[in-house]
Amino acid sequence: MTPEHLPTEQYEAQLAEKVARLQSMMAPFSGLVPEVFRSPVSHYRMRAEFRLWHDGDDLYHIMFDQQTKSRIRVDTFPAASQLINTLMKAMIAGVRDNHALRHKLFQIDYLTTLSNQAVVSLLYHKKLDEEWREAATALRDALRAQGLNVHLIGRATKTKIELDQDYIDERLPVAGKEMIYRQVENSFTQPNAAMNIQMLEWALEVTKDSKGDLLELYCGNGNFSLALARNFNRVLATEIAKPSVAAAQYNIAANHIDNVQIIRMAAEEFTQAMNGVREFNRLQGIDLKRYQCETIFVDPPRSGLDSETEKMVQAYPRILYISCNPETLCKNLETLSQTHTVSRLALFDQFPYTHHMECGVLLTAR
């Protein structure tokens, strides 16, 4: 695979290899055949980052070969959304001959939605001044005149200039209901929107007969918490990043959801609070004992769950675990399988044509 060519004819074969690999990895814990969720074969990534290469008068996006580290010119990127591809051409055309915008520009980041909104961030090795703001405003207005719903941001050391806003609002159809998700520039969002919809619908399906409340660790902008709220009496969720917490609070209001509570704290801190080890001012006014959480949802970073969180989640009758790294999932399962069995297993092809796998497991207490 190269940035400008996707081996779409190999999609089914690479997916079958992932299914076999996941099934083999999970064999010590489950004999289940994974439920498989396919990605679109192209235009599936909703965000992308590119370095910029200045070559005389020419200017273009580049990526680096992971093996050789050599640079690769990228004029089109079929893995990314159609909107990103349109913006890539428009940004180069708008920046190439404008000194204020081009000088010391080294990277452009694109974030888009299925609702055809975009935030484009321009990263510089220089101080951004009023001349830059005026030039960027003119570029933004020209892009909008082309029918592009885009917001521009300038970034430099200790500097961030928003011409109007640093977020976009995604709208996803999830099991018959439209969900609104505010996505903030430079914060985590699910890269493959079509796959995100399938993950949300799978999580809804496997928790449809739930009793009691849901606890979620690492909730981000509320992606899973808000979709799952319809299956539970109440949802209590934690997140450490301030922009994500703010986006989650907006999303709660935008989706008219009244049974989700977001707490800004790390999963490790929440574990300490639940175990009575420490008290936190952020939990004032929240009676943790009031929640009857029968299900816990975790979507941890690639490092998986730490040992203390492993012990904490074992106290719940059901554990819903979304993993972006099956190796650390299996490491966690060495502990979790002592008290729980794997009752559902899914493979989500979040990153086609790569070795990366996203998977989900539902664990029920023995």
From Swiss-Prot:
GO terms for molecular function: rRNA binding; tRNA (uracil(54)-C5)-methyltransferase activity, S-adenosyl methionine-dependent; tRNA binding. It catalyses: uridine(54) in tRNA + S-adenosyl-L-methionine = 5-methyluridine(54) in tRNA + S-adenosyl-L-homocysteine + H(+); uridine(341) in tmRNA + S-adenosyl-L-methionine = 5-methyluridine(341) in tmRNA + S-adenosyl-L-homocysteine + H(+). It comes from Salmonella typhimurium (strain LT2 / SGSC1412 / ATCC 700720). Gene3D superfamilies: 2.40.50.1070, Vaccinia Virus protein VP39. The active site is at residues 324, 358. This is tRNA/tmRNA (uracil-C(5))-methyltransferase. S-adenosyl-L-methionine binds at residues 190, 218, 223, 239, 299. It holds the Pfam family tRNA_U5-meth_tr. Belongs to the class I-like SAM-binding methyltransferase superfamily. RNA M5U methyltransferase family. TrmA subfamily. Keywords: Methyltransferase, S-adenosyl-L-methionine, Transferase, tRNA processing.
